From Swiss-Prot:
The keyword Cell membrane applies. The chain crosses the membrane at residues 48-68, 132-152, 174-194, 212-232. GO terms for biological process: protein insertion into membrane; protein transport. Keywords: Cell membrane, Chaperone, Lipoprotein, Membrane, Palmitate, Protein transport, Signal, Transmembrane, Transmembrane helix, Transport. It comes from Listeria innocua serovar 6a (strain ATCC BAA-680 / CLIP 11262). It is a multi-pass membrane protein. Required for the insertion and/or proper folding and/or complex formation of integral membrane proteins into the membrane. Involved in integration of membrane proteins that insert both dependently and independently of the Sec translocase complex, as well as at least some lipoproteins. A lipid is attached at C22 (N-palmitoyl cysteine). InterPro entries: YidC/ALB3/OXA1/COX18, YidC/Oxa/ALB_C, YidC/YidC1/YidC2_Firmicutes, YidC_ALB_C. This is Membrane protein insertase YidC 1.
Length: 275
C-alpha cells in the first residue's frame, strides 16, 4: 500500500509540475507531436461542438468533458472492479495479516523482522494479493488529455476570451477554483465508501492531495480548466457511486470487515473513556 501511495503521489506531483512549470506560450510553437496530434485536434473539437450550442464555449467544454469521461469510464470501471476484488481478498486474509503485523511490531531484531515480512509476502501470494497492480493507469491516461486541454485553452484566443456564467474562460476565477476543489473533496469521500477505517487512514494523504492540487492549480490556471475539473469531478462521483452499487454487493466480506473494524474502534473508544 505504501509503494502504491508513492507511485500515485509521484504521478500527481508530475502533473502539477507540468501544468504550473510550463510557462511557454503555446501559440508560439504549433509544431511537434504533442501540438499536432493532441492540442490542435482538441481545440478544433471544442470549436466544432461550440458551433452546435450557439458559439457557447463554456457549454462546449462541459460537453467535451462529459465525452472524455464517458470514453474513459470503461477503463475506470474495470479498475474499480479490480480494486473491489483486491479489497475482498484483503478482507479474507485480514486475520492472518493482523496476526503477522502484531508479531512484526513485537520483533526485536532485523533478522526476525525480515522473516516475519517473508511470512507476510507468503500470505499475499497465497491469496493472490498485489495492491499495486491497479489504480494508476486511468490517471496516467488522463494526464496527456489534461495537458492537451490546458494548452488548447491557452492557445485559442476564441476560447480564452469567451465569458461563461460569471467568469472568463481564459482567466483564473477564485469561486470556480474553490468549487472544483470542493467537488473533488466530495469525490474523495465518496470513493472511501466501503473501505475499512485502517484503509481510509492509509489512503488519506493521497486522497486529499488531489483536491488540494486542483485547488492550487485552479487559482492560477484559466477557469476553463477549473470548469473541466468541476464537471469531471461530478461525473466521477456519480461513476464511483455506480461502481459501489455494481460491485460491492458481489463482495459482502468487504462490508463485514468494515463493520467489524467499526465495532472494534467503538469498543476501544469506550475502554478509553472508562479509563
Amino acid at each position: 500500500m505504501k509503494k502504491k501511495n508513492i507511485i500515485l503521489i509521484s504521478v500527481l506531483l508530475g502533473a502539477l509540475l507540468l501544468i504550473t512549470g510550463c510557462s511557454m506560450d503555446p501559440s508560439q510553437n504549433t509544431d511537434g507531436f504533442f501540438s499536432t496530434y493532441l492540442i490542435q485536434p482538441f481545440t478544433s473539437f471544442i470549436m466544432f461542438v461550440a458551433k452546435f450550442v450557439g458559439g457557447n464555449y463554456g457549454i462546449a467544454i462541459i460537453i467535451t468533458t462529459l465525452l472524455i469521461r464517458a470514453l474513459i469510464m470503461p477503463l475506470n470501471l474495470r479498475t474499480a472492479k479490480a480494486q473491489m476484488g483486491m479489497q475482498s481478498k484483503m478482507a479474507v486474509a485480514k486475520p492472518e495479516i493482523d496476526e503477522i503485523q502484531a508479531r512484526l511490531k513485537r520483533a526485536t531484531s532485523k533478522e526476525e523482522q525480515a522473516n516475519i515480512q517473508k511470512e507476510m509476502m507468503a500470505v499475499y501470494s497465497k491469496y493472490n494479493i498485489n495492491p499495486i497492480q491497479m489504480g494508476c493507469l486511468p490517471l496516467l491516461i488522463q494526464m496527456p488529455i489534461l495537458m492537451a486541454f490546458y494548452y488548447a485553452i491557452r492557445g485559442s484566443s476564441e476560447i480564452a476570451s469567451h465569458t461563461f456564467l460569471w467568469f472568463n474562460l481564459g482567466s483564473p476565477d477564485m469561486v470556480l477554483a474553490i468549487i472544483a476543489g470542493l467537488v473533488y473533496l466530495a469525490q474523495y469521500f465518496v470513493s472511501m465508501i466501503g473501505y475499512s477505517p485502517e484503509q481510509k487512514k492509509q489512503m488519506k494523504i493521497i486522497g486529499l492531495m488531489s483536491p488540494i492540487m486542483i485547488l492550487f492549480v485552479s487559482f492560477t490556471a484559466p477557469s476553463a480548466l477549473a470548469l473541466y475539473w468541476a464537471v469531471g469531478g461530478l461525473f466521477l462521483a456519480g461513476q464511483t457511486l455506480l461502481t459501489k452499487k455494481l460491485y460491492m454487493n458481489k463482495h459482502p466480506e468487504i462490508k463485514v470487515m468494515e463493520q467489524e473494524e467499526k465495532e472494534f474502534e467503538q469498543i476501544v473508544e469506550e475502554q478509553n473513556k472508562e479509563k
